[in-house]
Swiss-Prot record:
Keyword Zinc: yes
Gene coding for it: TES
Source species taxonomy: Eukaryota, Metazoa, Chordata, Craniata, Vertebrata
Keyword Repeat on entry: yes
Family statement drawn from the similarity comment of this UniProt entry: Belongs to the prickle / espinas / testin family.
Protein name: Testin
Superkingdom of the organism of origin: Eukaryota
Oligomer status and interactors: Interacts via LIM domain 1 with ZYX. Interacts (via LIM domain 3) with ENAH and VASP. Interacts with ALKBH4, talin, actin, alpha-actinin, GRIP1 and PXN. Interacts (via LIM domain 2) with ACTL7A (via N-terminus). Heterodimer with ACTL7A; the heterodimer interacts with ENAH to form a heterotrimer.
CDD domains attached to this UniProt entry: LIM1_Testin, LIM2_Testin, LIM3_Testin, PET_testin
Cell compartment(s), UniProt: Cytoplasm; Cell junction, Focal adhesion
Gene3D superfamilies: Cysteine Rich Protein (2.10.110.10)
An annotated Gene Ontology molecular function: zinc ion binding
GO cellular component term, pick one: focal adhesion
Listed InterPro entries: LIM1_Testin, LIM2_Testin, LIM3_Testin, PET_domain, PET_testin, Pk/Esn/Tes, Znf_LIM
Length: 421
C-alpha cells in the first residue's frame, strides 16, 4: 500500500463516528473525535464504545478478519467489491403471539446475535439462561453491552497492524507472526449442545450409583441408553454445579469435549465478562477473551492500548508504555525526565496538573503545587504553611495544633467558632 493510500485509510478511520454523542458524558462532550493515537475521544476522554456510534459493519469486518485463515471461515463471507471478510453473525428473530383482550398481536424480538445452531428452540433456551441485561435484544441494554464487549474484548489493534500507531517493519512482522500463532493455538468459538447428545468422557461426567451392578441380571443384560443418561449428571467447568436435565451447555473444542459450561458461566477468567459471541481463547486450562489472552502473552501500552512489540519500552506506575507514548494525558507532551502526577491512573505533567486538577487552598484560594506539603480534611485542603493554615477567626497558625473544622473554615477554639457564628 503506497503512502497516499495509507494516509487516506488513516483519515477514514478517524472519520468513523465523528460527532457522535457520548452516552456517558451526555452534553458535556461536544461529540466524538478520535484522538490521533490513544483510541479515545479527544473531547471527553471516553472510548468509542461509550459513544452512540453505529459500528455494526466495522465490527463485522473486524471479527471477519479475526476468523480469516482459520477453521471458522464458515462464519465469514467475502464482499465481492473488495474481498474483505465479513462476519456472518447469526441474527435470530422470534415472533410470540400476545393475547390482548379479544385481539391477538404479534410481539417480535430480534437478537443481534444468537448461537449458530439449527435448533431455534435450543438457541432461545440458551438466550433465556443469560442474565437479562446481557441478552443482545436489538435496542436494549443487552445489545449495548454486546457492542461494548466487542470493542473491549476484541480490539482491532490486537490483530491488524494497520490499526496501530506507526509500527516499524520489524514490529509489523512480529505482530503478524503473533496473530497467526494465536489463531492456530488458542482461538475458538463455543458450541451450544445438549449434554445428553454428547458422548462425554472425563471429570464433568458423574455417574450416580444405581444399585448393585455385580448381580447376575446386571452382568448379562444390555444397559438401556436412556436409563444411563438419566443416571448421569454433568457439572459446569466454571462453577462446578450440575447442569439441569434438558438445559443447553457450551463446549469449547480447544478445551476438549469433556468440559462444559452453563451459558452464563462461559466467561473470561480474567475479567469475568461473558465471552462475546462465544469467541474464546484457551490457555493453560482457562478461558480468556481476546484482550486478556493477549495481555498474558505481551505487554500492553497504557497510553495507546496497543500490544508492545518493540524491544525498548518503559515501565512506570506498574504499567507498560511505548517510549513515545509515555505522555501527559492532558497535553500529550512526553514525560521522560519530567515531573508528573498520576490522576485516575493517568500521568499528567506538572503544568497541566496545576491548571486542571490541583486542589485549591482554602486559605489563599490558589492551586496547591503537587510537590508542596498540604493539610487535607474531608474535601478541603490548605497549604501546610503559617500563611494559609490559620484559624478563620484570630489567624492563629494551626500547624501541629488541634482545630475545629466547620464548612471549610477551621477554628482554634470554641470561642473563635462562636464569634464567627
Amino acid at each position: 500500500m503506497d503512502l497516499e493510500a495509507r494516509v487516506k485509510k488513516m483519515g477514514l478511520g478517524h472519520e468513523q463516528g465523528f460527532g457522535a454523542p457520548c452516552l456517558k458524558c451526555k452534553e458535556k462532550c461536544e461529540g466524538f473525535e478520535l484522538h490521533f493515537w490513544r483510541k479515545i475521544c479527544r473531547n471527553c476522554k471516553c472510548g468509542q464504545e461509550e459513544h452512540d456510534v453505529l459500528l455494526s459493519n466495522e465490527e463485522d469486518r473486524k471479527v471477519g478478519k479475526l476468523f480469516e485463515d482459520t477453521k471458522y471461515t464458515t462464519l465469514i463471507a467475502k464482499l465481492k467489491s473488495d474481498g474483505i471478510p465479513m462476519y456472518k453473525r447469526n441474527v435470530m428473530i422470534l415472533t410470540n403471539p400476545v393475547a390482548a383482550k379479544k385481539n391477538i398481536s404479534i410481539n417480535t424480538v430480534t437478537y443481534e446475535w444468537a448461537p449458530p445452531v439449527h435448533n431455534q428452540a435450543l438457541a432461545r433456551q440458551y438466550m433465556q439462561m443469560l442474565p437479562k441485561e446481557k441478552q443482545p435484544v436489538a435496542g436494549s441494554e443487552g445489545a449495548q453491552y454486546r457492542k461494548k464487549q466487542l470493542a473491549k474484548q476484541l480490539p482491532a489493534h490486537d490483530q491488524d497492524p494497520s490499526k496501530c500507531h506507526e509500527l516499524t517493519p520489524r514490529e509489523v512482522k512480529e505482530m503478524e507472526q503473533f496473530v497467526k500463532k494465536y489463531k492456530n493455538e488458542a482461538l475458538g468459538v463455543g458450541d451450544v449442545k445438549l449434554p445428553q447428545e454428547m458422548d462425554t468422557q472425563g471429570p464433568n461426567r458423574i455417574y450416580i450409583p444405581g444399585g448393585d451392578r455385580s448381580t447376575a441380571a446386571a452382568v448379562g443384560a444390555m444397559e438401556d441408553k436412556s436409563a444411563e443418561q438419566k443416571g448421569t449428571q454433568y457439572s459446569c467447568y466454571c462453577c462446578k454445579l450440575s447442569m439441569k436435565e434438558g438445559d443447553p451447555a457450551v463446549y469449547a473444542e480447544r478445551a476438549g469435549y469433556d468440559k462444559l459450561w452453563h451459558p452464563a458461566c462461559f466467561v473470561c477468567s480474567a475479567c469475568s465478562e461473558l465471552l462475546v459471541d462465544m469467541i474464546y481463547f484457551w490457555k493453560n486450562g482457562k478461558l480468556y477473551c481476546g484482550r486478556h489472552y493477549c495481555d498474558s502473552e505481551k505487554p500492553r501500552c497504557a497510553g495507546c492500548d496497543e500490544l508492545i512489540f518493540s524491544n525498548e519500552y518503559t515501565q512506570a506506575e506498574n504499567q507498560n508504555w511505548h517510549l513515545k507514548h509515555f505522555c501527559c494525558f492532558d497535553c500529550d507532551n512526553i514525560l521522560a525526565g519530567e515531573i508528573y502526577v498520576m490522576v485516575n491512573d493517568k500521568p499528567v505533567c506538572k503544568p497541566c496538573y496545576v491548571k486542571n486538577h490541583a486542589v485549591v487552598c482554602q486559605g489563599c484560594h490558589n492551586a496547591i503545587d503537587p510537590e508542596v506539603q498540604r493539610v487535607t480534611y474531608n474535601n478541603f485542603s490548605w497549604h501546610a504553611s503559617t500563611e494559609c493554615f490559620l484559624c478563620s477567626c484570630c489567624s492563629k497558625c494551626l500547624i501541629g495544633q488541634k482545630f475545629m473544622p466547620v464548612e471549610g473554615m477551621v477554628f482554634c477554639s470554641v470561642e473563635c467558632k462562636k464569634m464567627m457564628s
